[in-house]
């Protein structure tokens, strides 16, 4: 996501002084989408990202750990539709490069056949540093996500949004699941990506609430001053403030094969943030849920997607995950002018994971699952 980034740092910390005081207008959006390259015959992951990056503007594409993965970045837009148009344009560019490189392009939360032991870490100082620091842990993190950025003005406001939106991470994951396979095997889950990612890396998964900007800044000082982390990009939580961009970054979504689904998810994330901004501005603040009250719902989302059960935070009764997402959309729509009609259609369809499993059950082949993802990724890009 391209936004103005500050240079100055708070003393002894990782934070730009002007974090959440400058930047894009509040409520504007951007996104990052991670895609994979594969061999057209074997459908296994195959390199080429570094060649693409050398030929394209840095504000449009960036490297993401391995040479078979490219991150597409959007500009700043007021509506999800503008973000989605950027993502589709980036996909078209990547598809052209993939053809020249003898690759196919696809995106899903994990690659169904991907073997992390065969992947090359890109020649970028940050990722070579992580390879030395984390070794096996970082090498096995072959996952692909959709990240949504929501611009926020105000340090205390962004922490309030961060604390409160955590309880909706399971909702975001359940509706976006797109990774039932890992290393060529069915995992009996609907989001292997979420499990692999949160269990592989330090400072990943569901974060604790902070309650105030000073508590958040104090934590960054705690891990930054002694060099536990060298940059904010080493914090991989499901939700995180992004001080350099002055955004709240929602990182809970599996990457979507169908770009129309990506647009619906961006709209849901934005409307949820709108709702929490209105809550903050009304002065009727609500307490943040502790991690222990969120994790069970997240586990259900990982395991079952929209077909699982959540514990309702208000009644403590089990409710269908699909109903919980519908309820979130209703609540968000009451405080937001954003169009959530595409989400309504999405909730009536099988999840991306169910689409993968349908192909697998029909063909008995994980390779055919990967082929179908690449086919659908290509088919969703209109000819120019």
Curated annotation (Swiss-Prot):
InterPro entries for this protein: GCL_type2/YbdK_subfam, GCS2, Gln_synth/guanido_kin_cat_dom, YbdK
Superkingdom of the organism of origin: Bacteria
Short name of any one Pfam family annotated for the protein: GCS2
EC number: 6.3.2.2
Coiled coil: none
GO MF assignments: ATP binding; glutamate-cysteine ligase activity
Keywords: ATP-binding, Ligase, Nucleotide-binding
Catalytic activity annotation: L-cysteine + L-glutamate + ATP = gamma-L-glutamyl-L-cysteine + ADP + phosphate + H(+)
GO terms classed as biological process: modified amino acid biosynthetic process
The family this protein is said to belong to: Belongs to the glutamate--cysteine ligase type 2 family. YbdK subfamily.
PANTHER family for this protein: GLUTAMATE--CYSTEINE LIGASE 2-RELATED (PTHR36510:SF1)
HAMAP family linked: Glu_cys_ligase_2
NCBIfam families the UniProt entry points to: gshA_cyan_rel (TIGR02050)
Function: ATP-dependent carboxylate-amine ligase which exhibits weak glutamate--cysteine ligase activity.
Protein name: Putative glutamate--cysteine ligase 2-2
